[in-house]
Amino acid sequence: MSLFNKIVKEFQWGQHKVRLETGEIARQASGAVIVDIEDTVVLATVVGAKSAKPGQDFFPLTVDYIEKTYSAGKIPGGFFRREGRPSEHETLTSRLIDRPLRPLFPEGFYNEVQVVIHVLSVNPEIPADIPALIGASAALAVSGLPFNGPVGAARVAYVNNEYVLNPTREQIKASRLDLVVAGTERAVLMVESEADQLPEDVMLGAVVFGHEQMQTAIDAIHELVREGGKPEWDWQPAPKDEALNARVTELAQPELLAAYQIRDKQARSTKLKEVYAATSAKLEEEAVAAGTVAADKATVGNILFDLEAKIVRGQILNGEPRIDGRDTRTVRPIEIRTGVLPRTHGSALFTRGETQALVVATLGTKGDEQIIDALEGEYRERFMLHYNMPPFATGETGRVGSPKRREIGHGRLAKRALVACLPSADEFGYSIRVVSEITESNGSSSMASVCGGCLALMDAGVPMKAHVAGIAMGLILEGNKFAVLTDILGDEDHLGDMDFKVAGTADGVTALQMDIKIQGITKEIMQVALAQAKEGRMHILGKMKDAVAGANTQLSEFAPRMITIKINPEKIRDVIGKGGSVIRALTEETGTTIDISDDGVVTIASTNSEGMAEAKKRIENITAEIEVGHVYEGTVLKLLDFGAIVNLLPGKDGLLHISEIVNERVKDINDYLKEGQQVKVKVIQTDEKGRVRLSAKALLNEAAAQADTPPQQ
């Protein structure tokens, strides 16, 4: 009899065969599923605590996606030869998995849940993120935890005007769209995408296509649960204290209504804190007077939050002004300034209402490109975008240091939005780094980074294909009534049902990110949101074009200049030298940065034009071929009885025979030449062994012949 109760489900999904397994590996976890798609294999595990910690007032879900280097047949680098801190890709994939799972846990469920996905085997053509998301969903489904899933996921490409389900990496390279969508049987929960200026209807079509196709995976998970699922947890939410609810509402509602008439964020936040504190204090006072135990602050805080949401959502659905006084379609006031910082290569200050980004662009050489050692192989990134949001941006204190998951995710979204409009490496040979410093935040700071990033790039002289702008949309949905909000505030994001970010140009969408907190978002609602987002985007693009018509034609004086020359690939070793000695001396002596590609393209960069010209000249000399008939200014290296050895180019010498120095007979060569003397010579012969014969008297004869020729009338 086997130790294992192994359950396997296999199904065809588009062009791929998928295998789900449970019951053999990681049996002590609450749930564990292995997903295998064409040799990309992941193990997804879930462990849930049986009870919540005392005083817990939020849902502690953590998702960790971990890539093992052995999965690609590699040994990790570094001194310890083992996996270290999560890479940016692992962090982004962890967020991608977390986002559709989190909304499906019931309200009031505060038990700690940890989802861990290990990548065990990798087919370089099959990205591991979709198997990981399917695996996490399946592991939660079989675990018995209170989870309103399962979730399905799909990647969609757009090749030759057709949608492609779960494309290979080669297909993604040829695609104008890379979109990941996740959802349940009835609703879309999450979208993450990058596109090449595609129209809104194509983007929405991709979301709908992906949602339809993921049903195959959801059906397979249901079958796996029927045969191998654990008993469902007997979890019930804590009963609501209706009397406490009524008393909190009685005490706080008038004050909360007054707070939400305050348009300034800081003043409103201060008033809300006062309401929370006063309500808790009053309840404690009443409990002491009655000789009872006061309700804990977490419970009171949750009631107040629900009351806030009810007030704000009701006002918007009833057609009243939003928190800051706007209607649903108005974008906050925009201020733009470029060239903000004097010695950076490009900079812009983009302010939209109470959200502000100081964005800086820096140009570098090929040597500044980021080298990424991924499971599928090493590659280079010439465009980097980093997003930082310090605590002072929201008027708070907090930790300052390495970027958090949110900052990495926002930076990647802004990068996706801009990359489609960057010039190619052939058109603009620089590596580019953009840093967005969020100096104020009240909603949509990632989209401010897109706008500011585009402006900073143009200020740096990067020839962008078009202006790129981004906008964040929100949604309030109650029954059949809904309102789509343009350019949402932080509070509206917090209290609303959807965060929907769209970036693009006047011609189409370049990035789309959607996180939906509820079920019931229809295709029609998404159509309205996309149309309203386009309206807002076009407004912002107009403001950007008024401020900056196009890219600067001149680079900053502090940016490196570049020249490119082509050499014979066989000469690359001559330029590099033994152990890099020649190229090291070249860069140090000329103050330049030199990059050589395998095809013989040499890029020389420097802020000093004279040093760049000198480096170019020396490389051309090193790689030049000696040609018969050419005249060279050489240096006498050594005198012999029968002639002199003359250096023509670095590493290239020739023989000036004693009979080729002058026309008359030379008795003593020392009467005509000295070692170290500069001498002009002509190449008269080379042989198959590379030996070179030179002549000085040939030049004397040519000069005499020209002198004897009478001038033409």
From Swiss-Prot:
Residues of the KH domain: 560-619
Gene Ontology terms for molecular function: 3'-5'-RNA exonuclease activity; magnesium ion binding; polyribonucleotide nucleotidyltransferase activity; RNA binding
InterPro entries given in the database record: ExoRNase_PH_dom1, ExoRNase_PH_dom2, ExoRNase_PH_dom2_sf, KH_dom, KH_dom_type_1, KH_dom_type_1_sf, NA-bd_OB-fold, PNPase
EC number(s) per entry: 2.7.7.8
Gene3D superfamilies: GHMP Kinase, N-terminal domain, K Homology domain, type 1, Nucleic acid-binding proteins
Superkingdom in the source lineage: Bacteria
Reaction equations catalysed: RNA(n+1) + phosphate = RNA(n) + a ribonucleoside 5'-diphosphate
Keywords carried by this UniProt record: Cytoplasm, Magnesium, Metal-binding, Nucleotidyltransferase, RNA-binding, Transferase
Occurrences of domain S1 motif (ranges): 629-697
Any Gene Ontology biological process: mRNA catabolic process
Disulfide bonds: none
Binding site for Mg(2+): D493, D499
Cofactor: Mg(2+)
Family listed: Belongs to the polyribonucleotide nucleotidyltransferase family.
Protein name in the entry: Polyribonucleotide nucleotidyltransferase
Organism from which the protein derives: Burkholderia pseudomallei (strain K96243)
Lineage: Bacteria, Pseudomonadati, Pseudomonadota, Betaproteobacteria, Burkholderiales
Gene that produces this protein: pnp
